[in-house]
């Protein structure tokens, strides 16, 4: 009997050890899950930081490109200035060469004059007055020549000075080209000061050159006054233009300062809002830390929090308002990517992050320039629209309609693909949410099963205790003599054995109940344990040796199983039931995988998406039909144009045919006239031969006359005159025929040339129309992109505000629910 009890006790201790190990493994699994969640959160934060770093790098590269563009423009401007100075120096060199030639000629004249004067000194008849006049006339060229040589020296010195200044400017420009793009502000200011000083030196040199040139022109060339006045007028105009540009620059700087002040105010407002958001986040975190855990917070705490706004990330499909596709068609059709990274406009977020810089001002100026170009295009179209014929306008309209229909077709296809993508995305999000619900329900069911198993085990022990107590009471009644004969020894032995078995069963049940109480004290935290018998969780999970010694000492414990222990066991059963009920409350309602959710708030969204998809398909078909109709119209217009060209060719061929017929008729009439003249000549010869009676019979016998008889009868002069007249008429007719043929050829050539010119003109107009359409579309795209970006920024701000308000409302609702709920020992997932 003792061996059986020991074996049973060993089995109970091994079962207890296995349960303790399973509890330790469950706690370790929970730690692993928590560590995995932390790892995923750190990975998300790392991805967010990488995105921010990439964005910062993109902004840095954009600023570097803008800085390079500014440097290139300034370099080109200074190179143009240097080129102008080179041209001025070349002109001055030419003038200096001309002055040198004039001085050489004057020196030659002076030498000739001196030779003449030396010859005149030998003459005795010359008086002193003529000598004085000659001396004065000699002194004037000497002074003039000395002044010219001095001016030449000054010009050469000035030329060397200008060459030195220009070499310095070129060195500055080359050094600016070779300098790196990452210059500091002090170095940039230093370069600007050097360039300004160089430009001042250059202006001073130009002024000195102009002054010397004016002096030279006034002293030596009086006819250069007009040129000097013209240059002075041009210089005055340039100075006025410079003053106007300086005033414009000052106004732009004032506007820039105002914009900087506005941006500073916006930054202060942004910093204030950020501080307020941080304060709200800290308050929420403090409220979350102080508030007790509840199963009602399970669904809200498992959702990720947006690090920028601190809101709970919810599904956008459940909060969005459905919009009909007909009302949303223009908005969807405008979604396009940016043209290029270099032409990317400056956004509002960049202005708020980096402040107002030169790139922003250049971008605004570029936008104004684009707008001015568009206005010029429309003004040109308006001013030159009357010169285009109706056929060209019709052709342009047909081509524009065809292109617009093609664009609308592509837009409708893009809308359909966008809606399909959104639908697939919503389905994927719904499936992921459904998978999360299934996982949550599986975890809850696993916990409920564990609680149910513990309850069943406790009920089995209570049943064993009740049965042992019942058998013990029955044995005591038998021992007391209730229901048995008084003198039966075998009955007494049976009663003693029954009492012994009842005591053993009672002892075994009490030991099992004590072990279960110890395990429940370790797992449930000893909320209902009695002092002296409670065991903490870390004591139950410390080591295997400790658990084995605890179980062995508990079996030999002198304390008996009291009613208080039984009540504790019943309290644990009630606690397990409460925990199981709390876990069941956390289970979510599941929908089918293959159908849409039937909730009231999501169903209208599904209907709106279905309507949007149907509308997008119908719009695509409509745009395809419009495109086909536009193409058919274009083909019909081309066929009509070919028909008109063929009709023109046919009319020209008919005119040629009429001309050829007239020519043939004229030739026929000429031939008939010649025949009539010959007949008249023959009749005149026959009437002259009627006087001879002897030849009448011969004439009657031979009706035709021979050539010899004709020569004998007609005079040679008449025949010669007729032949000359016939030859003259034939020449005239040939000349007229040649004139008609040449005129016809000229007409055909001119018509062909006009046709080619009209075709070329049509092609030029087509190209101009395509260029105008492309420019208009580009400007329209830019304007639409700007509007879209502003709308997106505004919607982002509104959504951020709404999400913050919604997050605060959710937090308030959760806190109110936690405060209103009674404080019980509830278990959260």
Curated annotation (Swiss-Prot):
**Disulfide-bonded cysteines:** none
Residues modified as Phosphoserine: 828
Q: What is the effect of changing residue 828 to D?
A: Higher membrane localization, reduced formation of lamellipodia, accumulation of MYH10 at the cell cortex
Name a GO molecular-function annotation.
signaling receptor activity
Residue ranges, compositional bias (Basic and acidic residues): 123-132, 689-698
Any one Gene Ontology BP term: negative regulation of epithelial cell migration
Result for mutant: residue 486 to L = In a colorectal cancer sample
Q: Is Nucleus one of the keywords UniProt gives this record? A: yes
Give residue numbers for sequence motif Nuclear localization signal: 766-782
Note the effect listed for residue 490 to L: In a colorectal cancer sample
UniProt-reported outcome of changing residue 698 to V:
In colorectal cancer samples; somatic mutation
Please give the Pfam families that the UniProt record associates with this protein: USHBP1_PDZ-bd
Annotated Polar residues bias: 285-312
Places the protein is found = Cell membrane; Cell projection, Lamellipodium; Nucleus; Cytoplasm
**Keyword terms, alphabetized:** Cell membrane, Cell projection, Cytoplasm, Membrane, Nucleus, Phosphoprotein, Tumor suppressor, Wnt signaling pathway
Ranges for the region named Disordered are 114-139, 282-320, 672-700
**Chain ranges for the short sequence motif PDZ-binding as given in the UniProt record:** 826-829
- GO CC terms, sorted: cytoplasm; cytosol; lamellipodium; nucleoplasm; nucleus; plasma membrane
Q: How does this chain assemble?
A: Interacts with SCRIB (via phosphorylated PDZ-binding motif), EZR, SNX27, NHERF1 and NHERF2. Interacts with CTNNB1; the interaction is enhanced upon Wnt stimulation. Interacts with MYH10. Interacts with CCAR2.
The entry's function note states: Candidate for the putative colorectal tumor suppressor gene located at 5q21. Suppresses cell proliferation and the Wnt/b-catenin pathway in colorectal cancer cells. Inhibits DNA binding of b-catenin/TCF/LEF transcription factors. Involved in cell migration independently of RAC1, CDC42 and p21-activated kinase (PAK) activation.
* Protein name listed in UniProt: Colorectal mutant cancer protein
């Amino acid at each position: 009997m003792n061996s059986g009890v020991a074996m049973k006790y060993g089995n109970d201790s091994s079962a207890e050890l296995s349960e303790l190990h399973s509890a330790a493994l469950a706690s370790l699994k929970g730690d692993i899950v928590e560590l995995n969640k932390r790892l995923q959160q750190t990975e998300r934060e790392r991805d967010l930081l990488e995105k921010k770093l990439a964005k910062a790098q993109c902004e840095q590269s954009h600023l570097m490109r803008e800085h390079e563009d500014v440097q290139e423009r300034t370099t080109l401007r200074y190179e143009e200035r240097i080129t102008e100075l080179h041209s001025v120096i070349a002109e001055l060199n030419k003038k200096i060469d001309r002055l040198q030639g004039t001085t050489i000629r004057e020196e030659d004249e002076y030498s000739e004059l001196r030779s003449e004067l030396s010859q005149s000194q030998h003459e005795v008849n010359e008086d002193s007055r003529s000598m004085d006049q000659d001396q004065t006339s000699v002194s004037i060229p000497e002074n003039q020549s000395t002044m010219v040589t001095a001016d030449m020296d000054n010009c050469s010195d000035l030329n060397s000075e200008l060459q030195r200044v220009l070499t310095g400017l070129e060195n500055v420009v080359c050094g600016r080209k070779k300098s790196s793009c990452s210059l500091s502000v002090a170095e940039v200011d230093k370069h600007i000061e050097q360039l300004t000083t160089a430009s001042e030196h250059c202006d001073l040199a130009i002024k000195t050159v102009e002054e010397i040139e004016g002096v030279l022109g006034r002293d030596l060339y009086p006819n250069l006054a007009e040129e000097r006045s013209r240059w002075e007028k041009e210089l005055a105009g340039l100075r006025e233009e410079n003053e106007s540009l300086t005033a414009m620059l000052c106004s732009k700087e004032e506007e820039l300062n105002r914009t900087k002040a506005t941006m500073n105010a916006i930054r202060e407002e942004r910093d204030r809002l950020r501080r307020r958001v941080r304060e709200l986040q800290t308050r929420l975190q403090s409220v979350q830390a102080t508030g007790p855990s509840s199963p009602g917070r399970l669904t809200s705490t498992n959702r990720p929090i947006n690090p920028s706004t601190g809101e709970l990330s919810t599904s956008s499909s459940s909060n969005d308002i459905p919009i009909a596709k007909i009302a949303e068609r223009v908005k969807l059709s405008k979604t396009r990517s940016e043209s290029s990274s270099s032409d990317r406009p400056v956004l509002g977020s960049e202005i708020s992050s980096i402040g107002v810089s030169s790139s922003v001002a250049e971008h605004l100026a570029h936008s104004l320039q684009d707008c001015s170009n568009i206005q010029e295009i429309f003004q040109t179209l308006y001013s030159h629209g009357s010169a285009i014929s109706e056929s060209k306008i019709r052709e342009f309209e047909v081509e524009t309609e065809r292109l617009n229909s093609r664009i609308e077709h592509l837009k409708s296809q893009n809308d359909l693909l966008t809606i399909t993508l959104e639908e697939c995305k919503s389905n994927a999000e719904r499936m992921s949410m459904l998978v999360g619900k299934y996982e949550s329900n599986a975890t809850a069911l696993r916990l409920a099963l564990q609680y149910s198993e513990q309850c069943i085990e406790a009920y089995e022990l209570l049943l064993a205790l009740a049965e042992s107590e019942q058998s013990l009471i029955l044995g005591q009644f038998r021992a007391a003599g209730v229901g048995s004969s008084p003198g039966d020894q075998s009955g007494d032995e049976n009663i003693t054995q029954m009492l012994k078995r009842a005591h053993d069963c009672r002892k075994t049940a009490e030991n099992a109940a004590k072990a279960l109480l110890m395990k429940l004290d370790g797992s449930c935290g000893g909320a209902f344990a009695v002092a002296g018998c409670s065991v903490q969780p870390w004591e139950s999970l410390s080591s295997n040796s400790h658990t084995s010694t605890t179980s062995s000492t508990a079996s030999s414990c002198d304390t008996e199983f009291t009613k208080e222990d039984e009540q504790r066991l019943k309290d644990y059963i009630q606690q397990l039931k409460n925990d199981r009920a709390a876990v069941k409350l956390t289970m979510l309602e599941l929908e089918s995988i293959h159908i849409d959710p039937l909730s009231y708030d999501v169903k209208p969204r599904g209907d709106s998406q279905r309507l949007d998809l149907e509308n997008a398909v119908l719009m695509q078909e409509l745009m395809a039909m419009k495109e086909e109709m536009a193409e058919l119209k274009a083909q019909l217009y081309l066929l009509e144009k070919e028909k008109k060209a063929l009709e023109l060719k046919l009319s020209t061929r008919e005119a040629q045919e009429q001309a050829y017929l007239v020519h043939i008729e004229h030739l026929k009439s000429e031939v008939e006239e010649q025949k009539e003249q010959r007949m008249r000549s023959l009749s005149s010869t026959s009437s002259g031969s009627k006087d001879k009676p002897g030849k009448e019979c011969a004439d009657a016998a031979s009706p035709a006359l021979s050539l010899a008889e004709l020569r004998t009868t007609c005079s040679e002069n008449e025949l010669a005159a007729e032949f000359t007249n016939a030859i003259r008429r034939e020449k005239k007719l040939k000349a007229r025929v040649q004139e008609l043929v040449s005129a016809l050829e000229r007409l055909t050539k001119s018509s062909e040339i006009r046709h080619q010119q009209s075709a070329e003109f049509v092609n030029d107009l087509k190209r101009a129309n395509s260029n105008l359409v492309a420019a208009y579309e580009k400007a329209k795209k830019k304007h639409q992109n700007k509007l879209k970006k502003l709308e997106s920024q505004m919607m982002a701000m509104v959504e951020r505000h709404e999400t913050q308000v919604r997050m605060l409302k959710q937090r308030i609702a959760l806190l109110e629910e936690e405060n209103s709920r009674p404080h019980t020992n509830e278990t959260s997932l």
